[in-house]
Design a protein with these regions (language model features):
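Interhelical loop and helix-boundary elements at the membrane-water interface
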Residues: 47-58, 108-121
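Non-catalytic, topology-defining segments of multipass membrane proteins
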Residues: 1-100, 135, 145-195
């Protein structure tokens, strides 16, 4: 459903729409219809997810704005004005755009080494600012692979976090695409980048 009318961030509607414009409009009827087909029962029944939904607003205010600002004032001895400016505006705004870049930049610019027939690309810049989430051609070619890339932790820190959670039992049943499958798909459908 990527890059179709059922995709809430459809890049075919332009860069602005896929980056941030989708937040300013009503959802396309195909997005709503596709969303109703998704089985969310495992998440709805998860006590941690329910806690997060129930307390989202207070957690966001505390963890996203209050704690970073207070830490900056009391540990770095920064003024309240600068701390609020940096933490509540600059950092937050940058993080929003880094997140949105996954649906815009990583669908428009980059290479398609795994499947040249899909729009999502491998984009180094997005991967750097979005903790490894810019390896979008791999992610859309092998959507069940929890790593969303073949690369090391340095370039994909999200995988490092998931693997750390697996060590303490918070993540389990991690699925990966086999090396043989990746090689076969790349050979048949990937963009020929190197000669």
């Amino acid at each position: 459903m990527s890059d179709t009318s059922a995709d809430p961030h459809d890049v075919n509607r332009g860069f602005f729409f896929s980056h941030v414009g989708w937040l300013m409009m009503k959802k396309h009827p195909d997005v709503i219809a596709a969303g109703k087909k998704i089985d969310m029962s495992d998440i709805i029944n998860d006590p941690v997810a329910r806690f997060h939904v129930k307390y989202f607003t207070i957690l966001k205010v505390m963890c996203c704005f209050l704690l970073p600002t207070v830490i900056m004032v009391y540990t770095w001895h920064e003024s309240w004005a600068i701390a609020i400016l940096i933490q509540c505006f600059v950092r937050y705004l940058l993080n929003l755009h880094f997140t949105w870049a996954v649906n815009s930049f990583a669908h428009l610019w980059g290479v398609t080494p795994y499947d040249r027939n899909v729009k999502p690309k491998e984009n180094w810049g997005v991967s750097i600012v979005a903790m490894g989430e810019g390896w979008h051609n791999f992610h859309h070619t092998f959507p069940w692979d929890y790593k969303a890339a073949e690369l090391s932790y340095f370039i994909n820190p999200t995988t490092l976090i998931i693997d750390a959670f697996a060590l303490i039992g918070w993540a389990y049943d991690r699925k990966i695409a086999s090396t043989n499958l990746i090689e076969a798909v790349t050979k048949n459908r990937g963009e020929k980048i190197c000669k």
